[in-house]
Amino acid sequence: DVMGFSAFWAGLVISLQYFATLLSRPHAGRYADLLGPKKIVVFGLGGCFLSGLSYLLAAWGSGWPLISLLLLCLGRVILGIGQSFAGTGSTLWGVGVVGSLHIGRVISWNGIVTYGAMAMGAPLGVLCYSHIGLSGLAGVIMAVALVAILCALPRAAVKAAKGKAMSFRAVLGRVWP
C-alpha cells in the first residue's frame, strides 16, 4: 500500500517466499547429503542475510516503486531458499549430533523453533517496521542472520549422509496421506 500497489501484489510478494521454500527443499536435502548439514545451514543463513540486503536496497529505492517491488520479490525468493536450506540442514545436523535414535526429538525441536519463530517473527516484524521503517527492519534481519552465522560457524560439523538418495517424489509419496 505504501508503494502504491494493490493487495494482490502484496499477497504475491508474501507468497513468493513459500513457493521458493517448497521448490528449493529437494535441492537443500541433496546438497546437505553432498556437502554436509552445517554448510547448508550457513548457506541458508547467508540467504537470510542477503534477503535483508535486498529489502534494504528496496527501501533505498523507494522513489522507484517498480524497482522496489522487484527487490522485495527478490528478497522473498532468497529468503524462501535460505529458509529451506537452513531448516533442512538444521534438522539433519541435529540428527547427526544426537543420532538417528532421537530423530523424532530433533524433528520436534525443529518444528517448535520454526513455528515459534514464525509466530513471534510476524508481529515483531510489524512492530519493527512501524518504529524503524523498512530500512531499519532490513538491518535487523541482516544482524540476526549474521549473529546466527557466527553462532553456527564454531560448532562441530557432522558427516554428510552416505545412504541411497531418494527422489523428492518418492519421499512425498511416503509421507502423503
Tell me what each language-model feature is.
Residues 24-36:
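Helix-to-loop junctions at the C-terminal end of transmembrane segments
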